[in-house]
Design a protein with these regions (language model features):
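Exported/periplasmic ABC-transporter solute-binding proteins
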Residues: 1, 6-16, 20-21, 25-30, ...
Length: 185
C-alpha cells in the first residue's frame, strides 16, 4: 500500500503517476559513517583534517556499491585531496554490507550509510563523516495507486514522520526529518 525509498527514486514513481498525488511524506535522512573491526583502535574522524589523516594512515579502505560508496569514491577522496594516495588501497564492496567485510578483517576502514553499518556484529561504529564532508540520502514514502488500504497507508506514513516514531528511527542510524535541526553552526 505504501512505498518507502530513496527520494529521487520515489520522484520517478510520482512522475509516472504510480503514487497517489500529494501523498509523499519526507521521512528520514541517512548519513554516511565509518566502522573499524571490533577491538581495533578507534581513529578520529571528527574533523576534516582528522578524517584525512585516518584515511592516509589506513592500509585498506572499503566502501559500498550504493550511492554512499559512489560518493566516497568519486567525491570524498577528491574533496580531501587524497584520491591519488588512496586509489590502490580503496575498494568497492559489491552486494554485501561493507561492515561484514571489515568484521572479517579484510579491510581496516569501512564506509556506508550509518543505518547499514550499525546492525552488523564484529565492528565498532566510529562515527559519521564530518558535516563538511557528509553525503545525505533522503528517504520518503508515498501511497501507491494500487493500494488496497490507502487511508491506512497515509496513517502509517503520518506515524513514521511523527515525533513519536523519532527515537526508533534514530536508533537505526537515520535522522528523522521531523527531528529538530541544530542550526547553531
Amino acid at each position: 500500500d505504501v512505498v518507502i525509498m530513496v527520494g529521487d527514486a520515489l520522484a520517478k514513481l510520482e512522475q509516472d503517476r504510480r503514487t497517489v498525488a500529494g501523498s509523499r511524506v519526507e521521512l528520514a535522512d541517512s548519513p554516511v559513517g565509518m566502522v573499524v573491526k571490533a577491538g581495533a583502535p578507534v581513529p578520529d574522524i571528527s574533523t576534516v583534517p582528522a578524517l584525512r589523516q585516518t584515511l592516509l594512515k589506513a592500509h585498506s579502505i572499503a566502501y559500498s556499491d550504493s550511492a554512499s560508496g559512489r560518493y566516497v569514491e568519486s567525491q570524498l577522496f577528491r574533496k580531501l585531496g587524497i584520491d591519488g594516495q588512496v586509489h590502490d588501497k580503496a575498494h568497492r564492496v559489491e552486494r554485501i554490507p561493507v561492515a561484514s567485510e571489515v568484521a572479517k578483517g579484510k579491510y581496516d576502514l569501512g564506509f556506508q550509510q550509518v543505518s547499514e553499518l550499525l546492525p552488523v556484529p564484529g565492528v565498532t561504529f566510529v562515527g559519521k563523516l564530518p558535516d563538511d564532508m557528509q553525503y545525505i540520502t533522503r528517504f520518503a514514502g508515498a501511497v501507491t495507486q494500487k493500494a488496497d488500504h490507502p487511508e491506512q497507508g497515509k496513517a502509517l506514513l503520518a506515524f513514521l514522520s511523527s515525533p513519536q516514531a523519532a527515537s526508533v528511527i534514530t536508533a537505526t542510524g537515520l535522522t528523522p526529518v521531523s527531528a529538530p535541526r541544530d542550526t547553531a553552526r
